[in-house]
């Protein structure tokens, strides 16, 4: 965890050192009138990174309903087809995409490969009758259900909050914030420098993904319903 105060201090000593964002009389400190802007850009960067990389994951249970093949993954369906847990609440605003799902004995299934489990939209699952029958037989005599593992956005932070990123992606976040702040300062020089920082951001996350420096690549895991407090 990185306190936002520490993150902003690193920006002040680094990419934003010679900009109006830094207090002239107190080097290493973001000027109070620009603090809110830096916080807003940081949250924007956290959304960008957490939608590009599966940094934060959640899980929710889906119980099949008779003669229903399409299941929207929304808060409106909690208590009917969807069940979350007190320690892992499902929120529409945090949902990014389905990663995979697990049947009642913990076997992993992926989406959009065989045609049996599809995502017609980013937050909707569609199952063939054959796949629902398979899950029903696996769960029998209990009701047919599966556990869905999904990617979540980074929570919005406050000025006293913490950033939850792998160490290598903190640099990426610094580059993202600096690129947008400097670009917004106006003028061709600032625009060019902002573009340069954004290009560096894209290179950095590209290398991170290619080399899996932040260990964000997906691996198969077993996840039975008895785990993690789900009923």
Q: Predicted regions: what is each one?
A:
Residues 1-231:
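Glycine-enriched, solvent-exposed interface loops adjoining structured elements
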């Amino acid at each position: 965890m990185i306190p936002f105060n520490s993150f902003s201090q690193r920006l002040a000593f680094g990419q934003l050192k010679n900009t109006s964002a830094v207090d002239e009389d107190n080097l290493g400190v973001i000027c109070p009138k620009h603090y809110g802007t830096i916080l807003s850009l940081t949250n924007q960067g956290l959304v960008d990174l957490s939608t590009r990389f599966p940094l934060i994951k959640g899980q929710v249970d889906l119980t099949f309903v008779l003669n229903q093949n399409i299941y929207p993954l929304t808060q409106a369906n909690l208590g009917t087809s969807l069940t979350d847990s007190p320690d892992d609440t499902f929120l529409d605003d945090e949902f990014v995409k389905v990663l995979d799902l697990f049947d009642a004995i913990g076997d992993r299934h992926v989406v959009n490969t065989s045609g049996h489990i599809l995502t017609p939209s980013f937050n909707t699952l569609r199952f063939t009758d054959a796949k629902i029958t398979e899950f029903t037989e696996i769960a029998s005599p209990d009701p047919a259900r599966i556990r869905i593992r999904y990617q979540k956005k980074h929570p919005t932070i406050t000025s006293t909050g913490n950033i939850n990123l792998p160490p290598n992606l903190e640099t990426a976040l610094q580059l993202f914030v600096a690129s947008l702040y400097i670009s917004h300062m106006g003028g061709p020089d600032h625009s060019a420098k902002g573009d340069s920082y954004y290009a560096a951001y894209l290179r950095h996350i590209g290398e991170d993904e290619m080399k899996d420096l932040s260990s964000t690549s997906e691996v198969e895991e077993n996840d039975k319903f008895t785990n993690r407090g789900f009923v």
